[in-house]
């Protein structure tokens, strides 16, 4: 069987290698526009920041090494320019000479990836304006950074790559400004209150962020000097554009392959609407594992999973892709973030009845060296108790919380299914009740009516108006609020009316919950706890 693979980075090389492992009698050819294949695109920001020192470390396999390792034939510098499904041929050209060659196939896999979206603004082609996609891009950025001539940089785009670039520029003594046109960072993967908390941490670390701003132009005499926006101008010695990507699928316009906004539609087997043509990676749609709807997941993990599955399906195994959850983790200055599943906003849009909770919980035994906290937002459907999503912020291993959630959501588990799991515990690693389980317990308490709260989003929206703030911290911490020492509450509290609306606030939320439990026992009927306490919320008493 002759299999032609268009694209040789993540999905393409995975398909090709797996095909040859399945059956070495296959003839598998990879056509790749660039000279590098199988490079670490997700590692590019860390090369800029000297976390990865040698550029060779970014190249997982050279074409020569890959060919010897797999038996796949690799043609670099070869760009596919036309596909003719009725003839089962692909026309490709040599990017250096322009010479065209016709390739035949029995099966075709399209894995041509994406390119940065180039905004239609003045000055985008000035010197020292960069995009980040290939090792060559990262090398050019680092070469400029290493001259010591860059003092200020503007990063356009507050997604994962943009923020990782900003962190690594900051580590090299550069002051980065991050701009984004949407109202929050890390959109749409995080609910706004979680994103805003992370933004505050970035600002504390010396990375100013401006959201809701449109970049309108770039000025400079030959090279960038200033970035113009809808609000103000920013001086800059460098600009890194990270404000979106577009699939490299223009050459497929007349093929009959179904697409959505340039992204190839596939079924659960990785097939397009045309027989014997498959698609994977950043140029292809997959589906959301919760909603079943088409989803775009331009992630290296998705590309590799889909590529491996397609290789097996070409061999006739009939394996269906479970779908994606938008799972992601990101390292930022002093804080890591992770997420999977639906946000609360997305869950509402999809017709669920979402209920959520935000906890601040120890990430390991509090007495163990290096112990810190996780801030975990857990979202479930109130009626079915099905787990829908998790978002995590913390200085430690946020990925382990995310990965537990991924497992549960993928299996369509309910909170009851996931309760009381025998998760790993030892003081250096976790807490006796795992942070995931702790948050699940709190959410179940809330659903069952044992924990009445305002979420941070509800509090910020003014829903606690009319409630009197009560300081339930370990020691007085909220100016202007009456202080109540939890351990001394053994009856009605002087100065607090049992009929009064009381908002109980502590450092993290747990102590306020315990206070609520006692006050309820002594006849207080209208108490609410502010989830995540003053660790997460700005609480002021008028």
Q: What does each model-identified segment do?
A:
Residues 110-172, 208, 261, 266-268, ...:
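Glycine-rich dinucleotide-binding loop and its adjacent helix/turn
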Residues 125-149, 222-226, 233-309, 405-408, ...:
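FAD-site-proximal beta/loop scaffold in flavoenzymes
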Residues 420-423, 427, 431, 438-456, ...:
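Rhodanese-like catalytic fold shared by cysteine-dependent sulfurtransferases
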Residues 59, 152-153, 160-217, 299-302, ...:
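Rossmann-like dinucleotide-binding cores of NAD(P)H-dependent redox enzymes
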Residues 5, 28, 109, 240, ...:
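Hydrophobic beta-strand scaffold positions of dinucleotide-using enzymes
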Residues 1-75, 160, 166-190, 327, ...:
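Beta1-alpha1 glycine-rich phosphate/pyrophosphate-binding loop at the start
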Residues 25-27, 66-69, 75-96, 103, ...:
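A Rossmann-like FAD-binding core segment of flavoenzymes
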Residues 1, 7-8, 283-396, 427-431, ...:
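Mid-to-C-terminal Rossmann-like scaffold of FAD/NAD(P)H-dependent oxidoreductases
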